[in-house]
């Protein structure tokens, strides 16, 4: 839905299971529509659609895409952005650092991302804006060297040129949002600025790269880095980096009472990454 300042506010579906297109569509009907009824039943409702590679390939089928467009019209909902960070499974079985595979050194990541843009292009009306979010290049431990590999920068730059081609026929404002995240190739605002400086320097067409590649600023990720959001966003704008999208999430605030600590143990699980800071003696300084 649109806010008073005309910005789009969407409900993101990555919180629901959906490896296949059928699973994804079922979550739209069973969960997203219930959220819509509780939040904005009379307004045109926006969906931030998470599509893994399998679901994306299935939805790219001409008939399925047509049926999905009809469903969107009937339900008075729309998709203006796609979460393209998790390529494969994102629920149930351990994900952890595997969520970064394939990374931006591979053709698989670029092909998958462009597939999502192709789907989005079909869902948007002429002249509209749309985005896809993606990982921050790679996982730090996958690329232990100090320098960012040229192949990664070239893949992202090449993706920008392909997005430019996709956007042209319908005059769409399409852009890719790279998402800084703890343990990612770039995780802080300073590292993000450094990455984009290298990206602009290595690219064959800086103007197109600046137009088509930006940052998906996930507030919870940068909060884990103890960053001030106002300062971080101001820095990105100052350096001419496009703000592709903002991710907002909420968390419970609880005092460390015995009962609360017991309840929080439910969050000890093997599926997702948990950021922990240890001292030299091995003692936990902080765990996020």
Locate predicted features.
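N-terminal pre-domain/capping segments
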Residues: 1-127, 131, 161, 207-212, ...
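Active-site beta-loop-alpha junctions enriched in small/polar residues
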Residues: 14-16, 50-54, 84-87, 135-139, ...
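Intrinsically disordered, low-complexity acidic/polar segments
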Residues: 20, 56, 141, 255-257
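Short, solvent-exposed loop/turn segments at secondary-structure boundaries
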Residues: 57-61, 143-147, 227
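A broadly tuned preference for mixed-charge, low-complexity surface segments
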Residues: 63-68, 130-137, 239, 271-274
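Active-site acidic/histidine proton-transfer and metal-coordination neighborhood
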Residues: 93-214
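Acidic/histidine-rich catalytic cores of soluble enzymes
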Residues: 163-287
């Amino acid at each position: 839905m649109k806010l008073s300042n005309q910005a789009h506010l969407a409900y993101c579906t990555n919180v629901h299971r959906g490896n296949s297109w059928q699973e994804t569509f079922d979550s739209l009907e069973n969960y997203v529509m219930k959220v819509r009824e509780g939040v904005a039943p009379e307004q045109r409702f926006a969906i931030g659609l998470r599509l893994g590679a399998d679901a994306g390939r299935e939805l790219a089928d001409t008939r399925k895409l047509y049926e999905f467009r009809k469903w969107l019209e009937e339900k008075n909902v729309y998709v203006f952005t796609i979460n393209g960070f998790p390529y494969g499974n994102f629920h149930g079985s351990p994900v952890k650092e595997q969520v970064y595979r394939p990374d931006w050194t591979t053709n698989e990541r670029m092909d998958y991302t462009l597939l999502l843009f192709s789907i989005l292009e079909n869902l948007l009306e002429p002249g509209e804006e749309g985005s896809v979010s993606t990982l921050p290049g790679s996982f730090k431990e996958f690329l232990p060297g100090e320098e960012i590999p040229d192949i990664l920068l070239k893949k992202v730059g090449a993706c920008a040129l392909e997005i430019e081609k996709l956007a042209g026929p319908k005059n769409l404002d399409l852009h890719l949002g790279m998402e800084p995240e703890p343990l990612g190739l770039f995780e802080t605002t300073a590292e993000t600025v450094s990455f984009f400086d290298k990206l602009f320097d290595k690219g064959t067409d800086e103007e197109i790269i600046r137009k088509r590649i930006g940052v998906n600023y996930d507030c919870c990720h940068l909060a884990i880095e103890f960053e001030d959001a106002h300062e971080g966003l101001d820095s990105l704008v100052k350096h001419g980096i496009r703000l592709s999208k903002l991710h907002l999430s909420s968390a419970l605030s609880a005092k460390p009472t015995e009962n609360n600590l017991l309840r929080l143990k439910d969050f000890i699980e093997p599926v997702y990454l948990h950021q922990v800071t240890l001292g030299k003696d091995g003692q936990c300084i902080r765990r996020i």
